[in-house]
Amino acid sequence: MGFYMLLTVALLLTSLMNVEATPVDQAERSALEKSGLGNRIQPRYDNCGDAEQTATSQSAWTKKPMMKNVKLPAIMWSQIAFKIKAKTKTKY
């Protein structure tokens, strides 16, 4: 039982050591938010529909992630690559 606990702790520690994230100071984060640097989502039906739909399409913003230099495990990269390949595959 003690061996498995030690093995679990060792695996958790090694997985935590592989994650590297560069912190962003609060001043830089607030400057990015105030400057409006984000990705605007452009719906295809921007000029169609009722006023409520237009109002929600005008406020559709996504923020860029603040973590830099994040290392993902290899299995996550393969899942991401699989999803991208599935989206770009064309049907004939």
UniProtKB/Swiss-Prot annotation:
Kindly indicate whether the keyword Secreted belongs to this entry. Answer: yes
Q: Which tissues show it? A: Expressed by the venom duct.
* Gene Ontology molecular function: toxin activity
Signal peptide segment? 1-21
Q: Which UniProt keywords apply?
A: Neurotoxin, Secreted, Signal, Toxin
Protein location: Secreted
Q: What is this protein called?
A: Turripeptide UID-02
